Amino acid sequence: MPVHHRRISIGFQGGHSLALRVIEEQLEELYRALDGGGWHELETEDGPVRLYLGQVVYIRAENDDQRVGFSV
């Protein structure tokens, strides 16, 4: 069964953002790690990314149902 990656955007103080694709378990670990602050390693589709959570302002996770074209 193929692994499904979810698109997320992580916003940082100063206005920069980082777009990544992660599996659901990694997203849940990131949410839990936010309370602790400090550094967190996130395994993404393209490889590991280390984030300093003290600078994170927001995390936006897109829904799984992506639509292309015209739909009703």
Regions found by a protein language model. Name each.
Residues 1-72:
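Eukaryotic intrinsically disordered, low-complexity regulatory linkers and tails enriched in Ser/Thr/Pro
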